[in-house]
């Protein structure tokens, strides 16, 4: 199973709102997801409250177990909008 971190589109016509989700790559864009880890609102000014929010701990976990971010999610990480906490699944499992 190939797992992707991607955007799920919500909102009305011409007023998009996206959830940042972890989903199987074979599932359709707005289909079933494994976990919701944040949201992105392109209608709000960049950097303003409510523009983007992500659970960095869960993002770090999913990146650690091999989930591949899509181009847009990778762009958020590279630009510094998302701070991914470094941590692998092995270190998380040892803590539990």
Swiss-Prot record:
Gene Ontology molecular function, alphabetical: structural constituent of ribosome
InterPro entries: Ribosomal_bS16 (IPR000307), Ribosomal_bS16_dom_sf (IPR023803)
Pfam families, A to Z: Ribosomal_S16
SUPFAM superfamilies to which the protein is assigned, alphabetical: Ribosomal protein S16
Keyword annotations from UniProtKB, A to Z: Ribonucleoprotein, Ribosomal protein
Keyword Ribosomal protein appears in the UniProt entry: yes
Keyword Ribosomal protein among UniProt keywords: yes
Annotated transmembrane regions: none
Cellular component aspect of the GO annotation: cytoplasm; small ribosomal subunit
Any one GO BP annotation for this protein: translation
Family: Belongs to the bacterial ribosomal protein bS16 family.
Name the record gives this protein: Small ribosomal subunit protein bS16
Organism in which the protein naturally occurs: Anaplasma phagocytophilum (strain HZ)
């Amino acid at each position: 199973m190939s797992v992707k971190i991607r955007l799920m589109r919500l909102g009305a016509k011409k007023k998009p709102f996206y959830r940042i989700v972890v989903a199987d790559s074979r599932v359709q864009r707005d289909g079933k997801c494994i976990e919701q880890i944040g949201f992105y609102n392109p209608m709000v000014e960049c950097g303003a409250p409510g523009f983007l929010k992500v659970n960095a701990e869960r993002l770090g976990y999913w990146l650690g177990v091999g989930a591949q971010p899509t181009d847009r999610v990778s762009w958020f990480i590279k630009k510094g909008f998302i701070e991914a906490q470094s941590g692998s699944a092995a270190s998380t499992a040892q803590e539990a």
